[in-house]
Amino acid sequence: MYALTNCKIYTGNDVLVKHAVIINGDKIEAVCPIESLPSEMNVVDLNGANLSPGFIDLQLNGCGGVMFNDEITAETIDTMHKANLKSGCTSFLPTLITSSDENMRQAIAAAREYQAKYPNQSLGLHLEGPYLNVMKKGIHSVDFIRPSDDTMIDTICANSDVIAKVTLAPENNKPEHIEKLVKAGIVVSIGHTNATYSEARKSFESGITFATHLFNAMTPMVGREPGVVGAIYDTPEVYAGIIADGFHVDYANIRIAHKIKGEKLVLVTDATAPAGAEMDYFIFVGKKVYYRDGKCVDENGTLGGSALTMIEAVQNTVEHVGIALDEALRMATLYPAKAIGVDEKLGRIKKGMIANLTVFDRDFNVKATVVNGQYEQN
């Protein structure tokens, strides 16, 4: 048992000073005033840094020089996790983009192997595709985009303990498939979609509760057709992920989206291999993607994921969007936890929660993380 002291604590509800967080095993034992700490308690002095719940990234294709699609193994997930810790992300959804059924099965096996060893780190796969709309494919390979079929939907449902989320284009897939996934406990997200406003609204009735990278690879909101963006704005209960790197979405649009969506707006990175690594290019599902000036683009200039980290997403949200730090932190912790239904154990600093925490200074440098109660200095 030990206590984290001399820090500003962002609990998810309050901002506390002159308090300590006591950690026992893998859980938070208590949050208490500093004067009530037992004198014999082991103490870690955080030198006035900020302490928040560990960041939760619901869309991570790769980082630290590796891509999940490129090498679909538990080792790749582990490399991603270790790279994440440098930027304060303690839990994430390894994201497999559009690929073959065989690769999807491989990803399920890799996720199962990793999650059996390491709880509360990978929270389940995010299958981004292949059930998308070719019109909004982005970097996804047209060779593998296809409608959902009964066999694979059954396979996905049978492995719902290691699959957290599926992104699909509802206009190209059966509502029964969406309903089946939802019934199995999987979050279904609208994305890479050319749906109209009314098609999107219908899909929310089928059980879709999330939207993948708001504004990107979806029909925009225009005067006579509100599109998918309008449908998301018009449906308060639907969550939306947003990429706050300054390239995918204008910061003013993030500010407007936050005014409308509030606690349903979630920071995601959609990161690729260059996040937390030094590299000029990488291969993304057989395509060469170049990393230049913070941007990841293919030879046609199509964005191929980001090089964003979660701490940078929080910093950009505070400094460029103008959202207060405590709310920006909730967008990276509590709201994603709620979106995938893990907020009973992650996303807040309070008694009984899993001790996944992030320590960062006023300049947004991550100083340390706590994962399952284990304190690790950066």
Swiss-Prot record:
Q: Cite the cofactor comment.
A: Binds 1 divalent metal cation per subunit. Ni(2+) ion is seen in the structure.
The UniProt record lists the EC number as 3.5.1.25
What general EC class does the enzyme of this chain belong to?
hydrolase
Q: Could you give a single Gene Ontology term from the biological process aspect?
A: N-acetylneuraminate catabolic process
Active-site residues? D270
- List the catalysed reactions: N-acetyl-D-glucosamine 6-phosphate + H2O = D-glucosamine 6-phosphate + acetate
What SUPFAM superfamilies does the annotation carry?
A: Composite domain of metallo-dependent hydrolases (SSF51338), Metallo-dependent hydrolases (SSF51556)
GO molecular function annotations of the record: metal ion binding; N-acetylglucosamine-6-phosphate deacetylase activity
Binding of a divalent metal cation: at which residues? Answer: E128, H192, H213
Per the UniProt record, one Pfam family is Amidohydro_1
Alphabetically sorted, this entry's keywords are:
Carbohydrate metabolism, Hydrolase, Metal-binding, Nickel
Superkingdom field = Bacteria
Q: Give the pathway annotation.
A: Amino-sugar metabolism; N-acetylneuraminate degradation; D-fructose 6-phosphate from N-acetylneuraminate: step 4/5
Obligatory cofactor(s): a divalent metal cation
Annotated residues that bind substrate are located at: I139, H140, N216, A217, R224, D245, G246, F247, H248, L303, G304, G305
Describe its function: Involved in the first committed step in the biosynthesis of amino-sugar-nucleotides. Catalyzes the hydrolysis of the N-acetyl group of N-acetylglucosamine-6-phosphate (GlcNAc-6-P) to yield glucosamine 6-phosphate and acetate.
How does the annotation summarize its subunit structure? Homodimer.
Similarity field = Belongs to the metallo-dependent hydrolases superfamily. NagA family.
> What protein name does the entry list?
N-acetylglucosamine-6-phosphate deacetylase
What is the species listed in this Swiss-Prot or TrEMBL entry? Vibrio cholerae serotype O1 (strain ATCC 39315 / El Tor Inaba N16961)
Instruction: State the organism's lineage.
Output: Bacteria, Pseudomonadati, Pseudomonadota, Gammaproteobacteria, Vibrionales
| Name of the gene | nagA
